[in-house]
Amino acid sequence: VVRRPDESLPVVTNEQGERFIDNSIALRITCGGKQIVDKVFTKESFASLVDARFLKYAILEGLVYDKTTPQGIIYAASICYPQSDLYVPLRLTVSADGKISMAKEELLEEVYGEDAVSN
């Protein structure tokens, strides 16, 4: 997994007028010298899962290995507003034959409700 600022992508401008360079992330998986996956992701790779209004002001923050399951290798990705806590968590599953499936993860607040922590 290699993340890099990608100046060929549109610049993201936040509400304060600050400009941010978006990232592209390359995922390469090999097994025994055989290439299974070689794909570059941008935030647009996830456009079918993320609201277009959010996507317009967000950047692709990261992609990290999560775990290996019988379904494949799981990666966690996030698209976020730059320099903020607002993000959309995503899950990528790479099957043994290199097929990639993507899904939006639920935020903990959505799973447990906003008043899950009470004193």
Q: Where are each of the predicted segments found?
A:
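Surface-exposed acidic loop/strand-edge motifs in secreted or periplasmic proteins
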Residues: V1-G62
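A short local loop/turn or secondary-structure capping micro-motif enriched for an aromatic residue
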Residues: S45-S48, Q83-S84, E109-G113
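Structural motif
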Residues: F20-A26, Q83-L90
